[in-house]
Amino acid sequence: MRLGFQACGAAKAGILKSERLNLWLNNGYHAAMEYMERNKEKRIDIKQLVPYAETIFSFLISYNGNQNEAAQSGVAAYALGEDYHKVLKIKLYNLLQIIQSAYPDFEARVFVDSAPLMERQWAVKAGLGWIGKNGCLINRTFGSRTFIAEMVCNYTSDYCEEQKNRCGTSKRCIESCPNHAIKPNGIIDSNRCISYQTIENKAAIPDGIRLQGYVYGCDICLNACIWNKKAAKYQAEDFAPSPEMLNLIDKIKNGSLEKQDFNKARKHSPIERVKYYKLLSNINAAQSEVD
């Protein structure tokens, strides 16, 4: 696709099933993410979020090319390049402008992981993959190392068929998690998830949580997945490791990280979600495991 997306699909607007969301919330698996308890109706019924919604277009873009840099960095691969929220929104707005130039009555809102919208579920309905045992969307070609973006519009479309779940009996992702965060039915206990603890949890890492070297995010269950091992290698230039992030990683490794290094790296990176003191706390917690 000209704008750089590797896949897209369309789903008819409707009401999503809420059983998994209810189970996740009722068990407290959302940890301190209290915002997940709000706007539940909007998460389930897209028309409460976008009243004119008729079609949800889902788009995927792969970052399956920077695993070498991520492997020993302690930073999840998705965070090594530009901030995907900003990059994908620009692409979607460019696409929207193109469509509206041809169809002036085309109305749409675009979303990139920033609203009460269940991106993975809509991507499944759009035929772009299935939900793996680790809760991630798995695409048959690109695996689960993809970013998801959505455009919700007032036009109807030809709709895609859902794919069958192809995880089979594999439990590699479940068995790989050092903290046993992966529960049945693709549900994640955030309290025990390295990604949650190093990003969303603003406090210190609790005792008993093993980071295995990670200081921002985690790729352990993704690396274990057989679909990622055979996924097509593709990485958009936007998501190639930036010099600032590579410098940050070097400074973390040699113990010389300073706030100015962090500030330079966070300007265009997803790591802006954490404060400097939180990253230092994560580094100390990870280091304490090997001391």
Q: Which residue stretches match the model-derived regions?
A:
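Auxiliary alpha/beta "docking" domains used to position bulky ligands
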Residues: 1-166
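Iron-sulfur cluster-binding cysteine motifs and their immediate structural context
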Residues: 13, 172-195, 201, 211-238
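Generic structural signal for alpha-helix starts
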Residues: 81, 103, 202-208
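Conserved active-site and cofactor/substrate-binding residues in soluble primary-metabolism enzymes
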Residues: 90, 146, 188, 216, ...
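A short beta-strand-loop-alpha-helix capping motif that often carries His-Thr
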Residues: 116, 194, 240-244
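Short, charged low-complexity linear segments at domain edges
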Residues: 138-162, 187-207, 259-263
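SIR2/sirtuin NAD+-dependent deacylase catalytic core
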Residues: 169
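Alpha-helical scaffold domains
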Residues: 207-291
